């Protein structure tokens, strides 16, 4: 189990990313557009750094297991880590997944 504080921090980052995502994308498009004058691009970059929280960036979000909070070995399709997924699959808790045999 991951510490509750770390899981909560990640949830806060997800919420901030949803809240500021649109504004961040607009500023990033201005910064990366070569047709806009350099002064405006620098102003947009300054605004991005000063006004938006650092945690509102998508890159700071970590995929974590929904049950344990484990940060590694997480399957995106299920939102579970490999250990929990294997346990749930072996007990038949996930529909459509069966142990292979040949």
Swiss-Prot record:
Keywords: Ribonucleoprotein, Ribosomal protein, RNA-binding, rRNA-binding. GO terms for molecular function: rRNA binding; structural constituent of ribosome. The keyword Ribosomal protein applies. GO terms for biological process: translation. Pfam families: Ribosomal_S14. SUPFAM superfamilies: Glucocorticoid receptor-like (DNA-binding domain). HAMAP family: Ribosomal_uS14_1 (MF_00537). Belongs to the universal ribosomal protein uS14 family. Binds 16S rRNA, required for the assembly of 30S particles and may also be responsible for determining the conformation of the 16S rRNA at the A site. Part of the 30S ribosomal subunit. Contacts proteins S3 and S10. This is Small ribosomal subunit protein uS14.
């Amino acid at each position: 189990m991951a510490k509750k504080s770390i899981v909560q921090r990640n949830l806060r980052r997800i919420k901030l990313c949803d809240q500021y995502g649109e504004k961040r994308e607009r500023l990033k498009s201005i910064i990366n557009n070569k047709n806009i004058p350099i002064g405006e691009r620098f102003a947009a970059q300054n605004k991005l750094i000063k006004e938006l929280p650092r945690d509102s960036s998508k890159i700071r979000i970590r995929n974590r297991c929904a049950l344990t909070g484990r940060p590694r070995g997480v399957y995106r399709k299920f939102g579970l880590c490999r250990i929990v997924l294997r346990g749930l699959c072996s007990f038949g808790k996930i529909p459509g997944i069966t142990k292979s045999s040949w």
